[in-house]
C-alpha cells in the first residue's frame, strides 16, 4: 500500500519521500491491476513453445544456480514441471512471459499483439541501408541481434613509450546486453510496437515501445 499523509499519496523520490503526481499514481495503480508477463495466452499450449529454447532455459538455469543437486533435479523434470517452477506456466497454462521467451515463432499470432524486434543500420546520410526483423523466442534475441552489429576494433598508441598499439572494441557488448535486457523487461507489449536496435556509424540507439520514466526525461536530467 502507498503511504498517505495530508490527503496525498507519497512515493520514493531519491533519498526522501515526495508527493506522487496523478500520472505517477495512475501508473502504479495500473501496475498493481495487471502484470502482462503473468497473464495467460488463452490458446497457447506447451506444444507451441520452442524445444530448443526450453533446453537453453534449462542450461541457463542450471548454470546460474551452480549446484549439482539442482541440476539433477532440473534434469528429472518434465518441461511442464520446469516451466511451472519458473512460474512461466500457471495452473498448466502458458503465460505471456513463457511465450515471449520460449515461444515458437510460427505461433506468434497467439499474442493479442505480436512482439518483434528490428535491427536497422544507417549510412552516412542517415538513411536505412539494411534491416532485419526478429521474432520470438526472446531468450536468443540478444545473440541474434548482436550478431548483426559491426563491432569494429580500434587500435591506438596510449603513449610514446610503447611500440605496440592498444586494441579496443567500438562497443562494450556486456553493456549493450544489459541495455537490451532493460528494453525487453520494460517494453509495453500491449502497444504492439517493436524494439529497435538502430546502428549508426558512430553510435547505437536502442528504443522500445512504452515509457520507462513517467512524463518527460528533462526533469530527471535537470532536477534543479
Regions found by a protein language model. Name each.
Residues 1-224:
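Conserved N-terminal catalytic/coupling substructures associated with nucleotide/phosphate chemistry
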Amino acid at each position: 500500500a502507498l503511504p498517505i499523509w495530508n490527503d496525498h499519496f507519497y512515493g520514493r523520490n531519491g533519498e526522501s519521500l515526495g508527493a506522487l503526481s496523478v500520472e505517477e499514481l495512475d501508473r502504479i495503480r495500473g501496475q498493481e491491476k495487471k502484470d502482462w508477463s503473468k497473464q495467460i495466452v488463452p490458446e497457447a499450449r506447451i506444444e507451441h513453445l520452442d524445444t530448443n529454447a526450453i533446453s537453453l532455459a534449462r542450461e541457463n538455469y542450471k548454470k546460474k544456480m551452480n549446484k549439482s543437486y539442482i541440476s539433477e533435479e532440473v534434469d528429472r523434470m518434465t518441461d511442464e514441471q520446469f516451466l511451472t517452477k519458473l512460474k512461466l506456466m500457471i495452473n498448466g497454462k502458458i503465460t505471456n512471459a513463457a511465450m515471449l521467451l520460449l515461444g515458437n515463432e510460427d505461433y506468434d499470432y497467439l499474442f493479442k499483439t505480436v512482439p518483434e524486434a528490428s535491427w536497422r543500420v544507417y549510412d552516412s546520410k542517415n538513411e536505412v541501408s539494411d534491416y532485419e526483423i526478429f521474432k520470438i523466442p526472446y531468450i536468443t534475441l540478444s545473440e541474434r541481434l548482436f550478431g548483426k552489429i559491426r563491432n569494429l576494433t580500434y587500435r591506438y598508441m596510449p603513449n610514446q613509450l610503447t611500440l605496440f598499439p592498444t586494441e579496443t572494441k567500438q562497443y562494450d557488448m556486456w553493456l549493450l546486453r544489459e541495455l537490451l535486457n532493460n528494453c525487453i523487461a520494460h517494453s509495453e507489449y500491449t502497444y504492439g510496437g517493436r524494439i529497435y536496435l538502430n546502428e549508426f556509424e558512430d553510435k547505437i540507439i536502442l528504443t522500445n515501445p512504452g515509457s520507462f520514466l513517467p512524463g518527460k526525461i528533462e526533469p530527471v536530467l535537470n532536477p534543479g
